[in-house]
Each structure stands twice: as C-alpha cells, then as structure tokens.
Curated annotation (Swiss-Prot):
GO terms classed as biological process: cell wall organization; peptidoglycan biosynthetic process; regulation of cell shape
Pfam families assigned to the protein according to its UniProt record, in alphabetical order: KH_KhpA-B
Main location: cytoplasm
Domain KH: 29-76
Family (UniProt): Belongs to the KhpA RNA-binding protein family.
Domain of life: Bacteria
Protein location: Cytoplasm
PROSITE patterns reported in the protein's UniProt record: KH_TYPE_1
Name the UniProt record assigns to this protein: RNA-binding protein KhpA
Record key words, sorted: Cell shape, Cell wall biogenesis/degradation, Chaperone, Cytoplasm, RNA-binding
One Gene Ontology term, aspect cellular component: cytoplasm
Main function: A probable RNA chaperone. Forms a complex with KhpB which binds to cellular RNA and controls its expression. Plays a role in peptidoglycan (PG) homeostasis and cell length regulation.
Amino acid sequence: MKTLVEHIAMALVDHPDDVRVSEHDDGHSLHIELSVHPDDMGKVIGKQGRTAKALRSVVYAAATKQKRRVRLDIID
C-alpha cells in the first residue's frame, strides 16, 4: 500500500524527493500518512479536493481487494 501511494504521489508533484509516506498498522486497519513539499500540496489535494479524493479511492479499492481497512491522511 505504501509503495502505491508513493508511486502515485511522486508522479503528481514537482519535488518527488520530498514525498514521504509512513504506514501504521494497528491490527484492525492501516493508517497511511502522505507528506509532500509545501509547494506541491495544491497538486496533491487538487481543485476542490478532487485529486485527493481520487487518490483515496484508488487506495481504498486496493485495500478492499486485500480485505483491509485503510485511512489515508495528507499532512503538511
């Protein structure tokens, strides 16, 4: 899951070296935190949050296939 988020985020941003993804598994669900360069935050969130929503949809679909629950947070 981490590599999926990392790969998509790196394709979206101008500063791919500043993309950081961390995973925390509490047994019941997977919590993923995505951090990007401040200049790239708008690209990851998108107009009215559409890009962030699409990214979450892809991650949720991948998690569903693995019968997992996942939460994706974009942090600054």
